[in-house]
């Protein structure tokens, strides 16, 4: 970690990444680490402040996540959020219990200390976001209440020990002045300095890549997605044609994707790119397979084999570059208790054993919005930088059931129309992810005077901040009608279209 930033201890909160992003938006470096990180390792980072995240546990329960009390003995400013406030109270001799009236959602915060530095320029009453079933019932000695709601103690402090805490979540947008409250802690109490910008990141990363790689060769699997594209541009800036990108056309890509990627990089960068057409190979392996997990494994295994074959042809290649980003790293760290690994990400710890390369991950400290900023700084066109996420297995998991060339071609055309219309209506950048799913279901229709018996497709569009929870996009009816008319009239093979209005949870954004 860069020294002099903010350390966020993760107790299993769904908002831990959001806290870090909020701090970084202020121009201050923030890093998320597991709550059980060794205190000496935390102190070695020389943090200006420490934030304790929320979490789903109860501090009084057996085996609940806790902290080494030593952390509170160094006079480093500490801010506890939700579970963090309850833990601070519990460890300092106060009491926490199940609340008779639990608080989930918006609540009115009233300040007890209007002049407190945390509430500088904050009105006496404001709306905050609560999400807790436990509450503080008895204050710890030497702590005082600085804000409350109708049903709970909402903020506390022990200024002598430099410890502060909120029962609510200032990091979420529903907390009206939450960003300013965090800002007051970061700059007013922790005295952090602005030390984080994408311009500085590019400069320092280019220098590090040059020093580490020297005159050796680097290979990178270019997918056309944002992360691998930005990683390629950043490494190319550092070492030029010592980088070779391998683009594998699996036959499961979006319409004209291979052509677009090759054109963008030919026009904007002096870069070695090998485009491998492996469509027939992938579709042959997928023939007859309907189980989604099996499809994922086949596509992943085949991709590695194709990549491996091509990588061996590049003389002097000692580094394998990947577009791993910070959320991949956070989600792949095993945290005891509440945050057991959420998922083993394909970019983290997933190297095949026979690929004897050193790993180069120039984006592993960045969130997705920061990756996009770096991409723009490096000259990647907006339409590439702002592309919606596309899964590694591609259309293989957007075609439910068996994958065939016919189905892939049908889905490609339908998806291209949906995306084209979203762009025309200036809606593309207002939704987080949009795509079409092809179902293994046929239904009767009428085209002209003839009966048809063709596939059903689904439009899926979701809005989200962190992709861990999501709502369906409330697209205008007139827009949906236009998309429906175009797909049903222009795409041979689809005669029925539906719109997915499921939120995550309980559904996921992708169908497989």
Curated annotation (Swiss-Prot):
Known pathway: Purine metabolism; GMP biosynthesis; GMP from XMP (L-Gln route): step 1/1
Which EC number(s) are documented for this chain?
A: 6.3.5.2
Which cysteines pair up through disulfides? They are none
Active site, renumbered? 82 (nucleophile), 169, 171
GO MF term set: ATP binding; GMP synthase activity
UniProt keyword ATP-binding, yes or no: yes
The record's catalysed reaction(s) read: XMP + L-glutamine + ATP + H2O = GMP + L-glutamate + AMP + diphosphate + 2 H(+)
**Xref: CDD domains:** GATase1_GMP_Synthase, GMP_synthase_C
The record describes the protein's role as: Catalyzes the synthesis of GMP from XMP.
Which HAMAP family does the entry mention?
GMP_synthase
Assembly and binders: Homodimer.
Q: List the protein's name.
A: GMP synthase [glutamine-hydrolyzing]
- Tell me the organism's taxonomic lineage: Bacteria, Fusobacteriati, Fusobacteriota, Fusobacteriia, Fusobacteriales
């Amino acid at each position: 970690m860069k020294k002099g930033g903010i350390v966020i201890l993760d107790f299993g909160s769904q908002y831990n990444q959001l806290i870090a992003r909020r701090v970084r938006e202020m121009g201050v470096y923030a890093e998320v680490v597991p709550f059980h990180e060794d205190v000496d390792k935390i102190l070695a980072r020389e943090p200006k402040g420490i934030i304790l995240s929320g979490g789903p546990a109860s501090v009084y329960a057996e085996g609940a996540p806790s902290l080494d009390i030593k952390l509170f003995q160094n006079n480093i400013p500490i801010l506890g959020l939700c579970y963090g406030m309850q833990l601070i109270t519990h460890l300092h001799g106060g009491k926490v219990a199940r609340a008779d009236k639990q608080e989930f959602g918006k609540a009115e915060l009233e300040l007890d200390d209007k002049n407190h530095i945390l509430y500088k320029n904050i009105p006496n009453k404001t709306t905050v976001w609560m999400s807790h079933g436990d509450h503080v019932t008895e204050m710890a000695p030497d702590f005082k209440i600085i804000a409350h709601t109708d049903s709970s103690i909402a903020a506390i402090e022990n200024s002598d020990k430099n410890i502060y805490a909120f029962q609510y979540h200032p990091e979420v947008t529903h907390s009206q002045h939450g960003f300013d409250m965090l800002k007051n802690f970061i700059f007013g109490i922790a005295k952090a300095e602005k030390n984080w910008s994408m311009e500085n990141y590019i400069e320092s990363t280019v220098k590090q890549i040059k020093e580490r790689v020297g005159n050796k060769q680097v290979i990178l699997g270019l997918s056309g997605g944002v992360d691998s594209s930005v990683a390629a541009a950043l490494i190319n800036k550092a070492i030029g044609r010592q980088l070779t990108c391998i683009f594998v056309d699996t036959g499961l890509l979006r319409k004209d994707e291979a052509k677009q990627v090759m054109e963008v990089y030919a026009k904007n960068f002096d870069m070695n790119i090998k485009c491998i057409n492996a469509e027939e190979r992938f579709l042959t392996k997928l023939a007859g397979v309907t189980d989604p997990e099996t499809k994922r494994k086949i596509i992943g295994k085949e991709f590695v084999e194709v990549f491996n074959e091509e990588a061996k042809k590049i003389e002097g290649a000692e580094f394998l570059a990947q577009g791993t980003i910070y959320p991949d790293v956070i989600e792949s760290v095993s945290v005891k208790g509440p945050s057991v690994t959420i998922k083993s990400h394909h970019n983290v710890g997933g190297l095949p054993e026979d690929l004897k390369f050193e790993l180069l991950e120039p984006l592993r400290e960045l969130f997705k919005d920061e990756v996009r900023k770096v991409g723009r700084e490096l000259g990647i066109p907006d339409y590439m930088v702002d592309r919606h996420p596309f899964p590694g297995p591609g259309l293989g998991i957007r075609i439910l059931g068996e994958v065939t060339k016919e189905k892939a071609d049908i889905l490609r055309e339908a998806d291209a129309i949906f995306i084209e219309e979203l762009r025309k209506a200036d809606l593309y950048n207002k939704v987080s992810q949009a795509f079409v799913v092809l179902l293994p279901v046929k239904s009767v229709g009428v085209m002209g005077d003839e009966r048809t018996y063709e596939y059903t497709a689904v439009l899926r569009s979701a809005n989200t901040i962190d992709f861990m929870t999501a709502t369906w996009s409330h697209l205008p009816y007139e827009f949906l009608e236009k998309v429906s008319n175009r797909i049903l009239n222009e795409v041979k093979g689809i005669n029925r279209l539906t719109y997915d209005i499921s939120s995550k949870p309980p559904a996921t954004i992708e169908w497989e």
